UniProtKB/Swiss-Prot annotation:
Organism the protein comes from: Caldicellulosiruptor bescii (strain ATCC BAA-1888 / DSM 6725 / KCTC 15123 / Z-1320)
Enzyme superclass (EC): transferase
InterPro entries: Pantoate_hydroxy_MeTrfase (IPR003700), Pyrv/PenolPyrv_kinase-like_dom (IPR015813), Pyrv_kinase-like_dom_sf (IPR040442)
Catalyzed chemical reaction(s): 3-methyl-2-oxobutanoate + (6R)-5,10-methylene-5,6,7,8-tetrahydrofolate + H2O = 2-dehydropantoate + (6S)-5,6,7,8-tetrahydrofolate
Intracellular or extracellular location(s): Cytoplasm
Keywords from the named record: Cytoplasm, Magnesium, Metal-binding, Pantothenate biosynthesis, Transferase
GN (gene name): panB
Pfam families documented for this protein: Pantoate_transf
Sites where the protein binds 3-methyl-2-oxobutanoate: D45, S46, D84, K113
GO CC list: cytoplasm
Biological role: Catalyzes the reversible reaction in which hydroxymethyl group from 5,10-methylenetetrahydrofolate is transferred onto alpha-ketoisovalerate to form ketopantoate.
Needed co-factor(s): Mg(2+)
Designated name of the protein: 3-methyl-2-oxobutanoate hydroxymethyltransferase
Length: 264
């Protein structure tokens, strides 16, 4: 099976085939997801919350991202690896944006994801001109949570919805190969999807997008601190882990483990 590329994703949109995307933060999970033929593995700055225990993505550094990109890329043979550019890694200067994007590509990412439009448009253009594929991100942009004042639904009002569609078109013109839409009304996402040639991948953006993305710890039932409406839990792995560890503790205390079959 050939590795997923930007061309693969464009062809999927043209054929009406849905794109699958899931976060991954380490080699083991990446290898499992890759074996399932997930199209895109996103090394998300959400690792700040689900891996590092922060209450937002803002404290995540380039060193954090580079470390996890290296791990995920080793486990991905089929899936495209996309890396989030963390807070303030591309907001100051064009030179800094290109340099940091290059670090993530050297670490093993195929592409980077950058949040926003107007405030960082020149940086997005510059990274693309440096021959680095960029995925856009509009709607709820978690790195701007302190500006928004929370994780509320975006583009509820007509003016904001219209601006969202305009921004998506601007990002496409800049050269992004796909756009993530987060936590916007379904009808707004539908309008964006119909307006663009590049794929639109939704998270909390309804069924009309060209693909969907979820945080792996959310959809596997492993993260209890944050339970948004848009997450479907496909398993309760957290409970399975608790049960397994509890059994292990009990067997060790009772002297039942290790048994003969586990001894040399």
């Amino acid at each position: 099976m050939n590795k997923v590329t930007t061309k693969t994703l464009f062809e999927k949109k043209q054929k009406g085939e849905k794109i699958t995307m899931i976060t991954a933060y380490d080699y083991t999970f990446a290898k499992i997801f890759d074996s399932c033929s997930v199209d895109i593995l996103l090394v998300g700055d959400s690792l700040g919350m689900v891996i590092l225990g922060y209450d937002s993505t803002i404290p995540v550094t380039m060193d954090d991202m580079e470390h996890h990109v290296r791990a995920v890329s080793r486990g991905a043979k089929y899936s495209m690896v996309v890396a989030d550019m963390p807070f303030l890694s591309y907001h100051t200067t064009i030179e800094e944006a290109v340099k940091n994007a290059g670090r993530l590509i050297r670490a093993g990412a195929y592409a980077v994801k950058m949040e926003g439009c107007d405030d960082v448009y020149d940086k997005i253009e510059a990274v693309i001109k440096a021959q680095i594929p960029v995925m856009g991100h509009l709607g709820l942009t978690p790195q701007s949570v302190n500006i928004f004042g929370g994780y509320d639904l975006r583009a509820k009002e007509e003016a904001e919805a219209k601006k969202l569609v305009e921004d998506a078109k601007k990002l496409e013109k800049a050269g992004v190969f796909a756009i993530v839409l987060e936590k916007v009304p379904s009808h707004v996402a539908k309008e964006v999807q119909r307006s663009l040639n590049v794929p639109v991948i939704g998270i909390g953006a309804g069924p009309y997008c060209d693909g969907q993305v979820l945080v792996c710890y959310d959809m596997l039932g492993m993260y209890e601190d944050f339970k948004p409406k848009f997450v479907k839990r496909y398993a309760e792995v957290g409970n399975m882990i608790k049960d397994a560890v509890t059994r292990y503790i009990e067997e060790v205390k009772k002297g039942e483990f290790p048994g003969k079959e586990h001894s040399y």
